[in-house]
Amino acid sequence: MKKLVVNKKYNNKKLDKFLKDNISTLSNNLFYKTLRKKDIKINGKRVSENVTVFENDEILVYIPDNLLENKLNLDIIYEDNNILLINKPSNIEVTGQDSLTEVVHKLYSSCEFKPMPCHRLDRNTSGLILFAKNTQALEILLNKFKHHEIEKHYLALVYGIPQKKNERLISYLFKDSSKSLVYISDVPKKGYQKIITSYSLIESFDNNTSLLDVEIETGRTHQIRAHLAHIGLPIIGDGKYGINEFNKKFKAKTQKLISYKLIFKFESDSKILEYLSKKSFELKSGKKLLF
């Protein structure tokens, strides 16, 4: 149970705003579930709606402590006044409800500008994700990603041995939102968007698997997973584009794909972020996490 008293800052604010700002691990789902069960009291009276609260209101929230434990400890790789670099675990979205961004916003709730993500990772892809900590940094970084002045590198453990040690792949991708799937074509088609994926072979193994460094110049949904599967190199552990037989063989419970390196190759004016030019950040534990 949590006991809270509304301060002047939250006078005439909604209940969810007050509670989520003051209970950092309270998600939208948990808030509304608790509300439906009438497990919230304001000044001794149970409430079932997202009511307005006022200064000095006493609020009791009847939620078991284990449900309020912080389920996601942020693994911060680097932070300064402008950027925040986090190692995202798998099985969490970057944005949306109960997402990494939501957790970041709760932890930085006292900041005037809450850190915002500058690029995306699929839900089941772990690794480096870059947040901007102010408006100017966000504008600069979004522009740098758009113009490919920041390289995004991934480690992928795939089934198969590539015919070439290095290759730049150009194909076309169609996203079927109704099925949550994408399709790849080698030739342009109506509704398909151009994708560019490059890989370099790091190492191949006796069990017919390979470790690849993968770089993407475009950032489409499921791009790496679908593109590699399209050329006969499915990512191990990928339940959507991989091969279940091999996933079971290698006892892979999660897909073997990690965002492990960001390289800043600024070619145009980067203003307050000039100090990042020619820098790189690498997740040293990336390779170990795949095996």
Question: Which sequence ranges carry the predicted segments?
Answer:
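RNA pseudouridine synthases
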Residues: 1-179, 205
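Short, well-ordered beta-strand micro-motif
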Residues: 60-62, 213, 263
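Short coil/loop residues immediately preceding or within conserved phosphate-binding loops
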Residues: 71, 112, 194-197, 209-211, ...
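Short, well-ordered beta-strand segments enriched in hydrophobic/aromatic residues
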Residues: 84, 210-215
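Non-catalytic RNA-recognition surface used by pseudouridine synthases
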Residues: 168, 177, 187-203
